[in-house]
Amino acid sequence: EIGVRLVGSEMCIRDRDERLFRKIEDKIKRAIFDYGLINDGDRILVGLSGGKDSLALVDLLGRRSKIYCPRFEVVVAHIVMTNIPYCSDREYLRSCAEEHDLPFIVHETSFDPSTDTRKSPCFLCSWTRRKALFEIAKAHKCNKIALGHHQDDILETLLMNLTHQGAFGTMPPRLRMDKFDMEIIRPMCLVEERELIQVAAWKGYRKQLKNCPYESGSSRSDMKELLRSLEAINPEARYSPVSYTHLRAHETDSYLV
């Protein structure tokens, strides 16, 4: 009888996790069609850092690319910052891409934080990675770059801009970069971070070792706490119309921060 209960409990947990994964897939499908993120014939580069968000994006887009409509191709790239002491399991990341028959590229680059003291090292690192993705995308004939930003990232960036820039702006689902003749898309823009945390545990995504010397200086963790505080006041705060005004238009400019 105890064994039956244990088996029944495991089945309930598996069913719950599978329902959550399908829910996330539905959110991505809605984002794709509502914001015109992916069209027939697109060749999309996905940046795979090794964190739960990018692992989930490779998993989800890899599965989605096998569906008939829209028809698109996915290429996966892992950017290695040689001046930051962190370690990623490249073979594991390669296996995650190859699980969906996706090409996997490793690209090494670096940045010098002393070249522009007006910008934070986190900004310079992010921009260097982004520039590398543009170069890889061009080299592999990709017309779009998919990033693993989720709903929490978008709302936290909104709060950062309001707090530090006094401006109402954040990362849009689709961003046209005319300078590079490229589009950046965020297919997980409607997915909550807590949903991805559950999926990562269910899927068993491996955590990558990281020891970034600049991480503690980031204000994003403060914005996470601020978002939690807002939700404590109003559990529906993240779904308010004000939070979603940035999703109504497809920006062609760079967002702030």
Give a label for each model feature:
Residues 21, 126, 216-219, 234, ...:
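Generic structural signal for well-ordered, non-membrane alpha-helical segments
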Residues 12, 121-128, 209-216:
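Functionally engaged cysteine thiol sites
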Residues 226-244:
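An accessory alpha-helical subdomain
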